[in-house]
A protein has these predicted regions:
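Pre-DFG segment of protein kinase catalytic domains
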Residues: 168-171
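Conserved HxN/HPN-centered segment at the entrance to the catalytic loop
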Residues: 47-59
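Helix-rich C-terminal or lid/interface subdomains of diverse kinases
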Residues: 186-252
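Internal "kinase-insert"/substrate-recognition segments embedded within catalytic cores
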Residues: 88-116
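Conserved short submotifs of the Hanks-type protein kinase catalytic core
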Residues: 64-78
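AlphaC helix of the protein kinase catalytic domain
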Residues: 79-87
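An alpha-helical support segment within catalytic cores of ATP-dependent transferases
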Residues: 106-153, 157, 163, 243, ...
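ATP-binding glycine-rich loop module of kinase domains
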Residues: 4-37, 44
Length: 252
């Protein structure tokens, strides 16, 4: 397979459109097989929920010694691109994202990993915060309600593709079963990290209005989801995450 038409170039993967397929190539030839299989298995387990807005997984192959996952190609533009092209429609696009999040959270899958387990492990393994703060976060996480709703785990305008064939949600690597409000808090955080604070606040307002959810309850998840992201982010983003952890009131 000859790779062409680079769609995105991330830290660990490159995504290509090739022969009508989406080809996600892991840059490191030594990428553990378990990592590749985990992404593919998680994606297929979400497919099994019957959600119709997820590109179909096709196969895992090796290209030039590197693992690659091949998916159905979702043609169109990302919601992020549409927002840049027509800022006047920002609220309309944010509402579309809210509706997608509600659709996803209305589903369940007992096969995907548990969100609270993941958050617990992520926070417990941190060395960037002191033990007192870590204890506060883990205690607070323990007290938060445990649900089994499908959570995308990384819903953002860049992961939503809009085209003539419909709307598709991509990048399901971080999908978990858990509390929908934690999933919304992660989306809010994604928007803030992308320097879209105004959009983040509007998104939260629209979500709460549509779902009849208290914004304060969603904000209670923010220090938890922020802490879980610390080890993955760049130094400038870590400063913002630490601010969320330190400034958000944790009601034990």
């Amino acid at each position: 397979m000859k790779l062409k038409n680079l769609i995105s170039d991330g830290e660990k993967v490159q995504v290509f459109e090739c022969e009508g397929k989406c080809v996600k190539v892991f840059k490191d030839p030594k990428e553990p097989k378990s990592v590749v299989l985990y992404e593919a298995i998680t994606h297929t387990r979400v497919e099994e929920t019957g959600y119709g807005k997820i590109p179909e997984f096709e196969e895992i192959v090796k290209i030039d010694g590197k693992y690659a996952i091949i998916y159905q190609y979702a043609e169109g533009k990302t919601l992020a691109a549409l927002m840049r092209e027509d800022p006047a429609k920002r609220d309309e696009y944010l509402q579309q994202m809210v509706d997608l999040q509600l659709e996803i959270n209305s589903l369940s899958s007992a096969k995907v990993s548990r969100l609270k387990d993941y958050l617990n492990r992520s926070i417990d393994g941190l060395d960037m915060i002191d033990d007192v703060k870590k204890y506060e976060l883990l205690t607070h996480l323990n007290k938060m309600p445990t649900h089994s709703k499908l959570c995308h785990g990384d819903l953002a305008p860049d992961n939503i593709i809009v085209g003539s064939g419909g709307v598709f949600v991509v990048d399901w690597l971080k999908a978990k079963q858990g509390n929908a409000s934690a999933d919304v808090a992660k989306t809010y955080l994604n928007l803030c990290l992308d320097h879209r604070t105004e959009s983040a606040e509007k998104y939260l307002k629209l979500y709460c209005e549509r779902s009849n959810t208290d914004a304060g309850y969603i904000r209670e998840w923010l220090p938890i989801v922020a802490a879980a992201q610390l080890k993955f982010k760049k130094p400038d983003q870590r400063e913002l995450l630490l601010a969320f952890i330190d400034m958000t009131d944790i009601r034990n």
